Every structure is written in structure tokens, then in C-alpha cells.
Amino acid sequence: MGCCGCSGGCGSSCGGCDSSCGSCGSGCRGCGPSCCAPVYCCKPVCCCVPACSCSSCGKRGCGSCGGSKGGCGSCGCSQCSCCKPCCCSSGCGSSCCQCSCCKPYCSQCSCCKPCCSSSGRGSSCCQSSCCKPCCSSSGCGSSCCQSSCCKPCCSQSRCCVPVCYQCKI
């Protein structure tokens, strides 16, 4: 009885062997025409569906680039750091997903837009806790909100309505 090779893809028809085939080698895994070395391959045949890697995922994430069959565990892509949202809790979207992006602040991440662009603060203040007007409850108008507003925001009389307060964040 002959043995089934893996050329042409993976699946139930791509694996298995009888007693005359010997043991499986270290190269007996993966998908595609070259996935079996030697050609006598024992089950299970590990396949990524679709085939994926850190480089093939890129900025897309792992949503459509994962899964496996044959009981072989997870595919490589799901284990890559570039397949994880980098700014999910900082005010930036998951579309900012690439390996160089997993840093605490969005301002350090080249693909993230500043999350506090309309709050009067600079991009260096880009995290979820600071995406609020800095003088909203201090008695000062929003026009008095500047990047330096962690200091008293009513130091100038034109900012005070009706009296001077300190910024409360």
C-alpha cells in the first residue's frame, strides 16, 4: 500500500501512511507542494488557514489570518506581536496595528493620530485619561485650555469667569 504525499494542499487526503512508510520527519508539516519531506507523511498534517505569518499580516491584524486544522494548534500569525492592536485603550483605533506601534503613548506611534487634537493639549498627551477639556470644571472657558494648563489656567484676567480657579482634571 502506498503513502499519501502532501502536494497540492492540505486536508484529509493529504496525510496518513501505512506500516511500510516509517516515521515522520521534522520536515513533515506545513502546506503546499513542498510541505512533505519526506513524501511519506504521517497525520496530522498542520495547516494554517489561510497560510499566514507576521509579514503577511502586516497592518491587517489577525482577524482573517489565523486558524488551523488537523489539531496542530494555532498558526504563527496569531503569535506575532504585529497582529495585536497597539493603541486600543489610548484613543487610537485598531487600524494602527503594526509591530513598531506597541508603545504606551500614541504620540510615540507613527501611525496613530493624536487623540486629543481638539482638547487644547498637545499630541504628547495622547492617552485615554487626558482626552478631555482641561478646564471644563474650573470656571474658565475652553479657550483658556492650553498644553500648559496643568498650571493655574486663570493666570490672566481674560480667562476668569467670574473669578480665578485652578485647573481640575
Swiss-Prot record:
Sequence repeat start-end pairs: 35-38, 41-44, 47-50, 82-85, 101-104, 130-134, 149-152, 159-162
Highest taxon in the source lineage: Eukaryota
Keyword Iron-sulfur: no
GO annotation, biological process: epidermis development
Keywords, comma-separated and alphabetical: Keratin, Repeat
An example Gene Ontology CC term for this record: cytosol
Region (8 X 4 AA repeats of C-C-X-P): 35-162
Listed GO MF terms: identical protein binding
Family of this protein: Belongs to the KRTAP type 5 family.
Biological function: In the hair cortex, hair keratin intermediate filaments are embedded in an interfilamentous matrix, consisting of hair keratin-associated protein (KRTAP), which are essential for the formation of a rigid and resistant hair shaft through their extensive disulfide bond cross-linking with abundant cysteine residues of hair keratins. The matrix proteins include the high-sulfur and high-glycine-tyrosine keratins.
Subunit structure: Interacts with hair keratins.
Protein name according to UniProt: Keratin-associated protein 5-9
Organism this protein belongs to: Homo sapiens
Species classification: Eukaryota, Metazoa, Chordata, Craniata, Vertebrata
Name of the gene this protein is made from: KRTAP5-9
